Amino acid sequence: MSARPDTPLLDTVSYPEDLRKLEPGQLRQLSDELRAEMISAVGVTGGHLGSGLGVVELTAAIHYVFNTPEDRLIWDVGHQCYPHKILTGRRDRIRTLRQGGGLSGFTKRSESEYDPFGAAHSSTSISAGLGFAVANKLKGEPGKAIAVIGDGAMSAGMAYEAMNNAEQAGNRLIVILNDNDMSIAPPVGGLSGYLARLMSSSEYLGLRSLASRMTAKVSRRVHTSLGKAEEYTKGLVTGGTLFEELGFYYVGPIDGHNLDHLIPVLENVRDAEEGPFLIHVRTVKGKGYAPAENSADKYHGVAKFDVVTGEQKKSTGGPPAYQNVFGETLAKLADSDPRICAITAAMPSGTGVDKFAKAHPDRAFDVGIAEQHGVTFAAGLAAQGMRPFAAIYSTFLQRAYDQVVHDVAIQNLPVRFAIDRAGLVGADGSTHAGSFDVTYLATLPNFVVMAAADEAELVHMTYTAAEHDSGPIAFRYPRGGGIGIDLPETPEKLEIGKGRIVKHGSKVALLSLGTRLEEAKRAADELEAKGLSTTIADMRFAKPLDTELIAQLMKNHEVVVTIEEASIGGLGAHVLTYASDEGLTDAGLKIRTMRLPDAFIEQDAPEKQYDEAGLTAPHIVDTVLKALRQNSAGVEEARA
C-alpha cells in the first residue's frame, strides 16, 4: 500500500470555514494536496475517481467564495463529490467510501449538513437547486443555491425543464456547467477567461441593465432586435445563446482549473443583483493523475489500484459477467436477424451493449441519459417491425415508467427490456439497487416478466425475448459474474409462463425467481438433512405465472415458500393472489413469501446485503421450520 501523501496545508482545513481563512494564493497548494489525498483514498477503496479529479479546483473555489452550508451546494449525480467530502468534515472517513457502514459514494442528506440534497441518478440538481432558491426567496431568508451539473447530465430533458422554470429564482440560483467532454464549447483560452470575468462583473451587468431600460423606451420590435443582437453577438464568442434563451445570464466558458479565473467569476456572480446565472466551466476528467488522463474512460469508475503505477487490482478469473453474456448472445442472434437492435441510455459497457455495438454498430443506439426517450424510441422501432432491446439498469428504468406504461404496455408493443443490475448491487447502495422492477412491471397488463437464475438461463431468455413478438417482455439479471455453469451452444426458446422443477420432494416446496436459486439449493440440502423432503422450482416467470405448476405444488406439499430478490408486490404477492382466488389455502396450506424488506438497504458487499435482507439459505431454512413450528434441530415445538 502506498504511503499517504504529505498534505500540510490540507491538514489545517477540516471545514469550509477553515478554507475561507486562507489567502487566495494558497488555494493552488491546497488543490494539489486535495487531489493527492483523493487519489490515495480511492486507491484504497475503489470508486469514481476521474470525475472528482476534474473538479478539485472548482470544489475549493466554490467553498472558498460561497458561505456553505448556508449557501446550498448541490452536486448532480455525485460521482464528483469526493473532494467536497474531504473539505466538509469527512476526511477522517474518506477511506471508508462505498464500504459497509462507511461514507456513501454520493451526496447524502443524512451524512452531512453540507449535503443538502442526495444524488446518484442524473440531472436532478437544477430542479432541486431551484426549489432551495425559491424557498429561501419566499421565506425571506438568505442563501444561494449552487447546482453543479456535468455536460453528460445535460443530455437529460429534466435539466432543461428546470432551466425553463428557473427565472423565478433570480440571483439566488447559480448553475455551474462542468463541461469535461469538449461537446459544447470551443476551446478555452485567455480571451474566453477574460470575457467571463468581464461579463460577470458588476460594471458589465449594470451597463446591460441600463441598456435594457433605455431600449425598452423604443418600439418593442427594436427593443427585441437589440436584445437578440447582443445575445447572438455574445453567443458567437461564448456559445451561450441557448442558455440566454432559457433566461440565464451566461458566463463562460472558463478554465475550471485556473483559480485566477474561477475566484473572481464566482465572486462576481455571488454579488450580482441579477440572475439566475449559468457559469460554463471547462475541466479535464482525471486531471492531475497521468494514468487517469491517459485512460480512455479517464478512470471514471475504478477498482482498488496502485497509486504509483495506476494499475488496478484485477479480480481473479471467474465466470463471465451477466451483462457480457447478454451482449454477446444478442450480437450472435443479430447476426441472423436484421430486425434486432439494441438501445442503451449512456451505459454501453455496463449493459453489454458495447459488445453488440462492435458487431452491429448501425443497430446500436446510445441515447444518452434519456431513458424516457429511449423507451419510446424502442416503442417506435417495435411499431415499425424491428425487434428492439432496451438494455437499462433496473434503477434507471424507473425514470421511464410512464413511457413503459403509456407507450409500450397500453399499445402492446413488443419492446424487449433487458434489465441489468437486478436485486442488490453492493457498493453503490440503495440508489442503484434493482429492487422494484418485478413489482412495477408485473402489475402491467400485456407484460411478460422473466428472471434468469444463472447465465445459461439468461442466454435462453435473451433468445426467448427476441422471438416474442406478441407484446412487451422483460428479463432481469444481477450485477457481476454468473455461477460458472456452461453456456448453451444453442439457445432454447422458453415456453411463456412455464417454470421448471430443479429438484423433486414431497413436504416443502421452494419457489425461486432469479438468482436466489443457488441459496434455495443450499437450503434444500439442509432441510433434507433434517428429514424434510424438499422440491425446488425455478419459476422463471413472475408473469404470467405457471399456475399449473403452482397448483400442483400447493396440493402436494405442506409448506410453500416463494423466494425473490425483489420488493413486496412481486412473485410472492402474485402467487398469494392466485392461491386465494383458487381457494388453495383453504385446507391449511402454509405459504410464506421471502422478498426484499420494506427498507432501503445501504452499501455493503452483496452477500452481506442479502444476509441483512434475510434472503440467504439459513433464512430460508428458518422460514420453513417456523412454518412447521419446528426448532433449528427439526424438532416440533410445543404449541401454546
Swiss-Prot record:
GO BP terms, alphabetized: 1-deoxy-D-xylulose 5-phosphate biosynthetic process; glyceraldehyde-3-phosphate metabolic process; terpenoid biosynthetic process; thiamine biosynthetic process
Positions with a binding annotation for Mg(2+): D151, N180
Question: Which UniProt keywords are present, listed alphabetically?
Answer: Isoprene biosynthesis, Magnesium, Metal-binding, Thiamine biosynthesis, Thiamine pyrophosphate, Transferase
Its Enzyme Commission number(s) read: 2.2.1.7
Q: Which domain of life is it from?
A: Bacteria
Pathway per the UniProt entry: Metabolic intermediate biosynthesis; 1-deoxy-D-xylulose 5-phosphate biosynthesis; 1-deoxy-D-xylulose 5-phosphate from D-glyceraldehyde 3-phosphate and pyruvate: step 1/1
Catalyzed reactions = D-glyceraldehyde 3-phosphate + pyruvate + H(+) = 1-deoxy-D-xylulose 5-phosphate + CO2
Among SMART domains, the record links this protein to: Transket_pyr (SM00861)
- List residues binding thiamine diphosphate: H79, A120, H121, S122, G152, A153, N180, Y289, E371
Cofactor info, note text: Binds 1 Mg(2+) ion per subunit. Binds 1 thiamine pyrophosphate per subunit.
The keyword Magnesium is annotated on this UniProt entry: yes
Cofactor(s) listed in the protein's UniProt record:
Mg(2+); thiamine diphosphate
Q: Which GO molecular-function terms appear in the entry?
A: 1-deoxy-D-xylulose-5-phosphate synthase activity; magnesium ion binding; thiamine pyrophosphate binding
Q: What quaternary structure, including any partners, is listed in this protein's UniProt entry?
A: Homodimer.
Regarding protein family, the annotation reads: Belongs to the transketolase family. DXPS subfamily.
Looking up HAMAP family in the UniProt record yields: DXP_synth (MF_00315)
- State the protein's purpose: Catalyzes the acyloin condensation reaction between C atoms 2 and 3 of pyruvate and glyceraldehyde 3-phosphate to yield 1-deoxy-D-xylulose-5-phosphate (DXP).
The family database entries (PANTHER family) matched by this protein are listed as: 1-D-DEOXYXYLULOSE 5-PHOSPHATE SYNTHASE-RELATED (PTHR43322), 1-DEOXY-D-XYLULOSE-5-PHOSPHATE SYNTHASE, CHLOROPLASTIC (PTHR43322:SF5)
State what protein this is by name. 1-deoxy-D-xylulose-5-phosphate synthase
